[in-house]
Amino acid sequence: MIPFKIRVPASTANIGPGFDSVGMALSLYLEVIVKEEVPHWYVIHPFDQSVPNDDSNLIISTALQVCPSLPSHIIEVISNIPLTRGLGSSASAIVAGIELANQLGALHLTTDEKIHLATKFEGHPDNVAASILGGTVIGAIDEGHVSVVRIESKELGVISVIPDEELNTNESRFVLPETFSFHHAVRASSISNVLVAALCEKKWEIVGEMMERDLFHEPYRSQLVPLLPSVREYAKRFGAYGTALSGAGPSLFILTPYENRQEIAEQLMKVFPKIEVCELEIDYEGVVVNMDISVNR
C-alpha cells in the first residue's frame, strides 16, 4: 500500500451570492504522498515555518480527529494552491486529512460521510464538498445535517486573479454584519436563488449578472480588495460573464465562455501585468487516490 498519493483540487466558494453554500473545484492541486511508517509524524512541505511539519499540521490533525489510532508516517506535500488567497487551501488540507485517515485506517468512508466530516471541520460545505466531488456544488448545513447537490458546468471557463497580498479568512469575516433586516435578507436570498437556478439551467449570462449583485458579503469585503471594481469592469469588457470574490478573497474569480477563456486571460494580463492571472479549468474528479506510484526521494 505504501507509498500512495492523495490529490485534492482547490476550490472557489460563494460565486457571489451563494454565500457559504455554492462552491466549484478548480485545477490547482494539493498532493500528499504517503511514505514509510515512522515513530512520529513528519510533514515535508514547500511552505514557510508558519506551516507545521509535525502532527499539528492541518492535514495530520484532521486525520487524527477522524482516526486517533493512525500509525505515524512521513508525508510529502506538493501544492500549487496559494495559501490564504481565497482558493480553498485549508479545505483541501482538511479533505486530504480525511482521505489520509480513510486509507491508513481502512475506514471505508462513503462520499457522504467524507462530506459530513469535512463540513463539520470546516463549518460550511461549499469548498470541501467541491474538493471531494469535483464540479460545482450547492450545499447546506442545518442542525448538523448536510445536503449537497453536484452539477457540471463544462461550458464555462475560469480565470483567477491572484493578488500578492494575503487575506486571512477570519479577518475577512470580521467585516461582515452579524444580522440583516428581513427586507435585506429577502433581497439577498432571491439573488442567490436565481444564481443557483441559472447554474442548473446553464443560463450563463444570468449567472454572471447574479454573481455581481451579491448582498451577503461583497459589499462589506470589497473594501479589503480594492482591485475588484477595475478587474470586474475589464473582464466584462473582454467578454466574461461575471467576476466575484473567490471565497473570502483577495483572489478574484471570473467566469467566461469556455472557448474564450484564454483570450480573456491574455487581455487581462496586459491590463494588470503585475498581478497573477491564471487560466484554470473546473476540476470534475474531486479527491483522487493513486496507489500505483513509486517514490525515489
From Swiss-Prot:
Its EC number is 2.7.1.39. One of its GO terms (biological process) is threonine biosynthetic process. GO terms for cellular component: cytoplasm. Disulfide bonds: none annotated. Keywords: Amino-acid biosynthesis, ATP-binding, Cytoplasm, Kinase, Nucleotide-binding, Threonine biosynthesis, Transferase. The keyword Cytoplasm applies. Pathway: Amino-acid biosynthesis; L-threonine biosynthesis; L-threonine from L-aspartate: step 4/5. It is an enzyme of class 2 (transferase). It comes from the Bacteria. Catalyzes the ATP-dependent phosphorylation of L-homoserine to L-homoserine phosphate. Belongs to the GHMP kinase family. Homoserine kinase subfamily. This is Homoserine kinase. It comes from Bacillus cytotoxicus (strain DSM 22905 / CIP 110041 / 391-98 / NVH 391-98). The gene is thrB.
